[in-house]
């Protein structure tokens, strides 16, 4: 579950029409949300509120080892953020839980929006350690922004400064990163394929998308290089409209290859599988993750609006391409004189055009049905009132089990989870040496708790 300040920053990106999901760092975000989700390791209480129209603050207390906490302050001059940020009583659970990222259906209609330069300032101080975090986001244009992050720790004598120069165009997302830690320099780029509009109609959308990205790093002091490349393919099922995502990542220096498969089996369940392999050590790992949502009903029904949009889409398509605007002189209902050579040729030509239009319209109707199914499935998720979600994941090599429950109770957001490790029990070895045998798995294995925690959030 996102922290309150991360949620406000997400609203800042949405209000400024900045698509963070196009960056290279978000390529494998869905598998991380479903398999590598974070488990609270202590009792954590977070109280947040919006003090003014442009400022937000948050107080956090934790019992990790000892009682500690943090105080966070955020300021932004973007007016549209105020209308997006909601308190815990009104906030939909699906907007703050890190879950499956629905692939956006690509429309090719360019919307004209008025851009205003905006900024975001963030500061966080920890106590009793007095460590300080700071961040600044500055949007210079619809495609360019700069992010500056700082970390200072007096106890560890660490001061790190990192700057991100980002450019987000229609097909490319580029990042230039400079850090004071080892004078680290990096460059990230992700390119989006399958986003060119149709030659017949610019309003058509693509049911699938393909992302390819790479990153390159170099420490200027130690001269240690680093690089990786990733591929992501997102699409929807033509029969059900359910989305699925495939990713492939490769680190050539360390020989690590990772593949993932994520799919929504229904509007309230998700499955993810991840396979890791190292070509140098020949080690492998297989991980699984599931997600089950509980909902009480729909906020409102949208089938009528979806059907109206479908009819409007179909009508606009046929009007824009003049499929039935044949010359009235040679209409299909006219009597043709076979003896007239010219008229007979015109009749044959119009018949060929009619057959082509019929075949073409059949394909369009098929595309239109797929579009309706995809929109209906997305509307079911957006219009449903989810009250809780249960996550579970396991890894064969690490032999662990992770469970997480997140939900809402009255005006609070709750998160509770635990991580268990499967170990071979010592009693099983003693039974073997004494001649005793048992086929029970409970006698062969034991569960060791690694962490357990509860997080409570409240915002007004």
Curated annotation (Swiss-Prot):
Transmembrane segments: none annotated. This is Mitochondrial distribution and morphology protein 10. Disulfide bonds: none annotated. Keywords: Membrane, Mitochondrion, Mitochondrion outer membrane, Transmembrane, Transmembrane beta strand. It is found in: Mitochondrion outer membrane. It comes from Candida glabrata (strain ATCC 2001 / BCRC 20586 / JCM 3761 / NBRC 0622 / NRRL Y-65 / CBS 138). Coiled coil: none annotated. Component of the ERMES/MDM complex, which serves as a molecular tether to connect the endoplasmic reticulum and mitochondria. Components of this complex are involved in the control of mitochondrial shape and protein biogenesis and may function in phospholipid exchange. MDM10 is involved in the late assembly steps of the general translocase of the mitochondrial outer membrane (TOM complex). Functions in the TOM40-specific route of the assembly of outer membrane beta-barrel proteins, including the association of TOM40 with the receptor TOM22 and small TOM proteins. The lineage of its organism: Eukaryota, Fungi, Dikarya, Ascomycota, Saccharomycotina. HAMAP family: Mdm10. PANTHER family: MITOCHONDRIAL DISTRIBUTION AND MORPHOLOGY PROTEIN 10. It comes from the Eukaryota. Belongs to the MDM10 family. One of its GO terms (biological process) is phospholipid transport. Component of the ER-mitochondria encounter structure (ERMES) or MDM complex, composed of MMM1, MDM10, MDM12 and MDM34. Associates with the mitochondrial outer membrane sorting assembly machinery SAM(core) complex. It holds the Pfam family MDM10.
């Amino acid at each position: 579950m996102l922290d309150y300040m991360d949620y406000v920053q997400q609203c800042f990106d949405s209000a400024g029409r900045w698509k963070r999901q196009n960056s290279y760092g978000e390529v494998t975000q869905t598998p991380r949300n479903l398999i590598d989700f974070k488990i609270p390791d202590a009792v954590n209480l977070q109280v947040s509120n919006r003090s003014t129209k442009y400022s937000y603050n948050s107080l956090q207390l934790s019992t990790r080892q000892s009682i500690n906490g943090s105080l966070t302050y955020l300021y932004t001059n973007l007016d549209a953020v105020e209308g997006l940020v909601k308190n815990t009583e009104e906030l939909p659970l699906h907007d703050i839980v890190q879950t499956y990222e629905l692939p956006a259906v690509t429309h090719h209609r360019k919307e004209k929006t008025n851009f205003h330069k905006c900024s975001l300032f963030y500061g966080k101080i920890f106590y009793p350690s007095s460590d300080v975090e700071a961040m600044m986001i500055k949007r210079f244009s619809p495609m360019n922004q700069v992010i500056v992050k700082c970390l200072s720790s007096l106890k560890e004598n660490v001061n790190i400064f990192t700057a991100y120069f980002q450019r987000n165009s229609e097909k490319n997302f580029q990042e230039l990163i400079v850090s004071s830690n080892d004078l680290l320099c990096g460059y990230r780029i992700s390119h989006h394929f399958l986003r060119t509009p149709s030659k017949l109609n610019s309003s058509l959308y693509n049911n699938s998308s393909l992302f390819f990205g790479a990153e390159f790093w170099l420490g200027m002091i130690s001269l240690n290089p680093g690089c990786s490349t990733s591929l992501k393919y997102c699409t929807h099922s033509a029969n059900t409209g359910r989305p699925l995502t495939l990713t492939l990542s490769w680190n050539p220096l360390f020989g690590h290859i990772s593949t993932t498969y994520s799919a929504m089996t229904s509007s309230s369940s998700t499955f993810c599988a991840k396979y890791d392999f190292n070509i140098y050590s020949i080690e492998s790992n297989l991980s699984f993750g599931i997600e089950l949502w509980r909902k009480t009903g729909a906020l409102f029904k949208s089938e009528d609006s979806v059907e109206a949009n479908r009819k409007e889409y179909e009508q606009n398509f046929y009007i824009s391409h003049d499929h039935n605007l044949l010359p009235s002189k040679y209409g299909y209902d006219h009597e043709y004189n076979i003896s007239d050579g010219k008229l007979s040729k015109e009749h044959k030509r119009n018949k060929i055009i009619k057959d082509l239009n019929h075949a073409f319209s059949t394909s369009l109707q098929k595309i239109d049905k797929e579009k309706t199914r995809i929109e209906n499935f997305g509307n079911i998720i957006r219009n449903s009132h989810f009250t809780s979600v249960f996550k579970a994941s396991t890894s064969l090599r690490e032999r662990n089990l992770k469970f997480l429950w997140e939900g809402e109770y009255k005006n609070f957001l709750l998160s509770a989870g635990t991580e268990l490790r499967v170990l071979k029990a010592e009693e099983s070895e003693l039974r073997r040496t004494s001649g005793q045998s048992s086929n029970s798995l409970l006698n062969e294995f034991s569960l060791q708790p690694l962490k357990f925690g509860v997080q409570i959030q409240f915002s007004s």
